[in-house]
Amino acid sequence: MASLQDIQRRISSTKKTRQITSAMQMVSTAKLSQIQKYSAGYGSYAARLEAVVEHLVSAHLFDNADADHIPLIAQRPIKKTGILVVTSDRGLVGSYNANVIKQTNVLMQNLNLDTSNTTILAVGGNGADFYKKRGFEVILEHRGVSDVPTFNEIRSVVKTVTSLYENEVFDALHVVYNHFVNRLTSEYRDVQLLPLTGDTLNAMGGTEEQKAELNVQATYEIEPDTTAVLNVVLPQFAQSLVYEAVLDAKTAEHAASSTAMKGATDNAKDLIGRLELQFNRARQAAITTEITEITGGMAALE
C-alpha cells in the first residue's frame, strides 16, 4: 500500500497537471473564438468568388473553353495523384490527426494508390512525418501554421499547389482535412480539387431552383476571350479553396485541442478526488493503528 507521503506527492503532481490542462483549454477556446471571427470575414469573400465561378459555369463558359490552354481544367491520364494532407504540428488534440491519416489511408486503398503513384503535400508536421516514414514522396511540407493563418501566410503553399499541377507533377489533386462542425465535432473531408470541371463546380452549394435562376441571368460578353478570363479566375478560385481548407482545419484543430484539454482537466479532477479519498482512508488506518498500539502498551503496563 502506498504511503501517505507518496499519495500526497501524487495529489500535488496531479493538481499541477490540472492547472496546466485547464490553462491550455482556456487558451484553445480563445483561439477558437478568434479564428471563427476571422473565418466569417473571409467567408464573405469566398462566397462572392464562388458566386462568380457559378455564374461562369451557368453561362456555359466551360463548355466552350479551350482546355488545352487552361491548365486547371485540362484533364489528362492520371499517372500520379497528389494528396494535400492538412494536420497539426503538435499533439494534445485528441484523435484529430489520427482521424485524418486513417481516412486518408482508406482513400488511398479505394483509389489503388501507393508510394509509386502518389505524392504527398503536407500542411502540418504530423502528416509529413507519418508519410515520410512510410516511404511516400513529400514534395511540399509546410510547418508552423499560425493560430489564425492569413492568406499571405499560406500564399506560397496555395500557389505552389496550382503550379505543381500545371507543371504536371501530378495529374489529380485531393485535399483531405478535418472539417469543423461545432466545438465538439469535426468530420473528415476529401475534396478532389484538380482538375476543375464544369460538373464539379456545378455541384457546389445551392438548390436546383437557384442554379436555374443563375442560368437565366447568366448572359455575358467576355473580353478579351474565355481562355483569358478563366485563366485569371480559376487559379484564384482553386487557391481560395486550398486556403479555406487550411483555415477550416485549423478551426477544427483548436476545437479538438479545447475538447482534449477539457477531458484531461476533468480526468485530473476525478483522479484527485480518488487520491484524496485514498489518502484519508490511509491516514485513518494509520491513526487507528497508532491508537491500538497505544492502548495495547497501556494495557501491558497495567
From Swiss-Prot:
Compartmental location: Cell membrane
Organism in which the protein naturally occurs: Leuconostoc mesenteroides subsp. mesenteroides (strain ATCC 8293 / DSM 20343 / BCRC 11652 / CCM 1803 / JCM 6124 / NCDO 523 / NBRC 100496 / NCIMB 8023 / NCTC 12954 / NRRL B-1118 / 37Y)
Family: Belongs to the ATPase gamma chain family.
Record-linked PANTHER family: ATP SYNTHASE GAMMA CHAIN, ATP SYNTHASE SUBUNIT GAMMA, MITOCHONDRIAL
Gene transcribed to yield this protein: atpG
GO biological process, one term: proton motive force-driven plasma membrane ATP synthesis
Functional note: Produces ATP from ADP in the presence of a proton gradient across the membrane. The gamma chain is believed to be important in regulating ATPase activity and the flow of protons through the CF(0) complex.
GO terms, molecular function: ATP binding; proton-transporting ATP synthase activity, rotational mechanism
Membrane-related topology note: Peripheral membrane protein
This protein's record includes keyword Transport: yes
Keyword Glycoprotein: no
Keywords associated with the record: ATP synthesis, Cell membrane, CF(1), Hydrogen ion transport, Ion transport, Membrane, Transport
Pfam families: ATP-synt (PF00231)
Protein name, entry field: ATP synthase gamma chain
